[in-house]
Amino acid sequence: MGNSPSYNPPAGISPSDWLNLLQSAQRLNPRPSPSDFTDLKNYIHWFHKTQKKPWTFTSGGPASCPPGKFGRVPLVLATLNEVLSNDEGAPGASAPEEQPPPYDPPAVLPIISEGNRNRHRAWALRELQDIKKEIENKAPGSQVWIQTLRLAILQADPTPADLEQLCQYIASPVDQTAHMTSLTAAIAAEAANTLQGFNPKMGTLTQQSAQPNAGDLRSQYQNLWLQAWKNLPTRPSVQPWSTIVQGPAESYVEFVNRLQISLADNLPDGVPKEPIIDSLSYANANKECQQILQGRGLVAAPVGQKLQACAHWAPKTKQPAILVHTPGPKMPGPRQPAPKRPPPGPCYRCLKEGHWARDCPTKTTGPPPGPCPICKDPSHWKRDCPTLKSKN
């Protein structure tokens, strides 16, 4: 932005203190050059390296800068010391005697009228992009948010129309509406207390501060515009509608319902929601629903027709594998003995029926039917012959 360096602070200084130094540098006369900002950055590096601690307003006064080494940095420090030590220069700051020591100076510099304001210029697109980049991750109304906008205002001296353009570029529609409500209330309260240089007969504060010779009146409007950011009402965090995407297993009806709820919470009344819903209901749908809408030619159709097309869509779920036991060949078990066949007649040993001769009870108890064929002894069987045992 102009001759200003990046708002990101160098090593050795907090973002708030760095923005305060940049605001003080903007009040140099003649106006600051790129070399002034380079000297300011080199001074911070030197202070952090030599003092072994971060730069602060209390530790880095005008006496901390060696004369002649860093250009006009001593003048920047003197301006900062004068503004932060002046009770009237810091709106909302209490007098030192009303606070217990030590007295902490205000962390945000006010906009100071610099006499004839002939520095006004319209925003360039690159300036708006730089401002948005610096505060895109900051909460609206936070200290760094306000200080960054304050420094941008110092460099361009914007009119109410320029500030409205800036608001539309950096803030969401909901924050724009809340800020406008807060600004309108602040202007009404200040008008009742008679703004310096404000004449109700010549129009509203917005109209009068837009005039080329508005002077202090424009500065007061700019202060009110910044103050309105601090008074934004708190609201519950709602998921931005642009980040709502249909999940792979989420039904299309539930996805569209979440999208409609987010738009209702984020967009102010009067802003048409149908074009956004019609666009995002296809762009943020999952691939399967997009294929259905493409096949039916409903990419740019209203959301109602898309709901009818995808109402019965269901995600394809993978069925778990089921292990089925298939009977195989039977393994052979223990061999069962064959049923005994009854003998055809009486046992030839005992002449009784019902058993075979091999199972005859008299086989082991009775005398052998004849002499042993080996030793001719009639008292034992052949298997019990002593001659066989002696040979073994």
Swiss-Prot record:
UniProt GO BP: viral budding via host ESCRT complex; viral translational frameshifting
Positions of CCHC-type zinc fingers: 345-362, 370-387
Motif (PPXY motif): 100-103
Any one GO cellular component localisation term in the record: viral nucleocapsid
Keywords, in A-Z order: Capsid protein, Host-virus interaction, Lipoprotein, Metal-binding, Myristate, Phosphoprotein, Repeat, Viral budding, Viral budding via the host ESCRT complexes, Viral matrix protein, Viral nucleoprotein, Viral release from host cell, Virion, Zinc, Zinc-finger
Family matches, as InterPro entries: D_retro_matrix (IPR003139), Gag_p24_C (IPR045345), Primate_lentivir_Gag_pol-like (IPR050195), Retrov_capsid_C (IPR008916), Retrov_capsid_N (IPR008919), Retrovr_matrix (IPR010999), Znf_CCHC (IPR001878), Znf_CCHC_sf (IPR036875)
Protein name in the entry: Gag polyprotein
Organism: Bovine leukemia virus (isolate Australian) (BLV)
